A protein has these predicted regions:
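Catalytic cores of secreted/periplasmic lytic hydrolases that degrade extracellular macromolecules
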Residues: 1-172
Length: 172
């Protein structure tokens, strides 16, 4: 893990852990999604719009928007680049709060809220259609395990990284 990645995880992890106490969304899931969706905070969406999660700005969204390109997989095989309008925020904290609010307000994400097993949470968010990538759940699980993100889920969590020998010095 690079120092930059470590700092990203620590920054988003603090926000996600605090948010988990209010929302019931596992911090490890939130961090993994932020890593995957924002490219470690380097995507144009994140740099210009503080958007960590690539949430599209639907017709009900009244906040700021950012136009950007994204990859969508409509047939389960082929990825297509499309341009869309995405939600933009004043800060990463606002992005994390809106992410959990989106999950909490939409019935399709009901299985994610309060789930304590990170693998089940990853499967649930993918099954609910958060992303079009058919390998989305597996990618999230791999990120959580590679970077031992369940440490942010708090004591007493049923979630345990399968590679419990993962250390901060591990590179990937």
């Amino acid at each position: 893990m690079t120092q930059e990645q470590k700092k990203f995880i620590e920054r988003v992890g603090a926000l996600a852990a605090a948010d988990m106490q209010k929302s019931g969304v596992l911090a490890s899931l939130t961090i993994a999604q932020a890593i995957l969706e924002s490219g470690w905070g380097k995507s144009g969406l994140t740099v210009k719009g503080n958007a960590l999660f690539g949430i599209k700005a639907g017709t009900n969204w009244t906040g700021a928007v950012y136009s950007g390109k994204t990859q969508e997989c409509y047939d389960g095989v082929t990825f297509t680049t499309v341009t869309g309008l995405f939600r933009a925020y004043g800060s990463w904290a606002e992005s994390v709060a809106d992410h959990s609010d989106l999950l909490s307000r939409n019935a399709r994400y009901k299985a994610v809220i309060g789930e304590r097993d990170y693998k089940a949470a990853c499967r649930a968010i993918a099954a609910a259609g958060y992303a079009t990538d058919p390998k989305y759940a597996g990618k999230l699980v791999q990120i959580i395990e590679t970077y031992a993100l369940t440490a942010y889920d708090g004591a007493g969590s049923a979630a345990k990284p399968s590679g419990s020998n993962t250390t901060a010095g591990t590179t990937r």
